[in-house]
């Protein structure tokens, strides 16, 4: 019982207190590795330019995503796609949940909508839904590494 009370206090404080009290701009480079619902690898690199106004951040993201594919002979290749997202996440929660809506495009694919969810600090588990017409895999799971860097943020 003595151990449970401090744990409950910590969890209550973590989920009900404000994490940040700042405003301003930030830039956040990030990399990701993951698998799709068929077990194929994917990776990505992105840069987000965002505006931090308590209690949310909003950012524009530009990135590249590579999907590993195998042809009929078993030879692997990496197909590259460009993506553009509008992202937002809540600052007042310790788990930092976020959502992104955007478009992805490649050589063999027109602009296609994409949807992304994530949560966490610095290393973020993520889920993406991309309805690629030329592929039956639509669900993508990954782990992001990001480094948010403040640009003229007040309150630091």
Predicted segments with their positions:
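Outer-membrane beta-barrel proteins and related beta-barrel translocases across Gram-negative bacteria
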Residues: 22-30, 114-120, 124-129, 155-156
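Residues that define the transmembrane beta-barrel architecture of outer-membrane proteins
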Residues: 23-27, 39-47, 56, 75-84, ...
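Outer-membrane beta-barrel "beta-signal"
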Residues: 138-156
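Short glycine/proline- and aromatic-enriched beta-strand/turn motifs that initiate or cap beta-hairpins
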Residues: 20-72, 148
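Transmembrane beta-barrel domains of outer membrane proteins
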Residues: 32, 48-52, 85-89, 104, ...
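Gram-negative outer-membrane beta-barrel proteins
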Residues: 35-39, 68-74, 105-109, 131-137, ...
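Repeated loop/turn-to-beta-strand initiation elements of outer-membrane beta-barrel proteins
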Residues: 53-62, 92-99, 121-127, 149-155
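Cleavable N-terminal export/targeting peptides
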Residues: 1-23, 155-156
């Amino acid at each position: 019982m003595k151990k449970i009370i401090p744990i409950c206090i910590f969890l209550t404080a973590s989920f009900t207190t404000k994490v940040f009290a700042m405003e301003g701009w930030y830039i956040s480079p990030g990399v990701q590795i993951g698998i799709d619902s068929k077990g194929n690898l994917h990776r990505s690199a992105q840069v987000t330019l965002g505006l931090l106004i308590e209690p949310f951040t909003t950012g524009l993201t530009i990135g590249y995503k590579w999907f590993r594919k195998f042809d009929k002979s078993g030879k692997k290749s990496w197909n590259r796609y460009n993506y553009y997202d509008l992202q937002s996440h809540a600052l007042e929660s310790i788990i930092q949940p976020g959502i992104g809506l955007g478009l992805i495009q490649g050589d063999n694919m027109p602009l296609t909508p994409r949807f992304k969810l994530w949560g966490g600090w610095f290393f973020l588990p993520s889920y993406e839904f991309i309805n690629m017409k030329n592929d039956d895999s639509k669900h993508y799971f990954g782990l992001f590494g990001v480094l948010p860097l403040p640009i003229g943020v007040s309150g630091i």
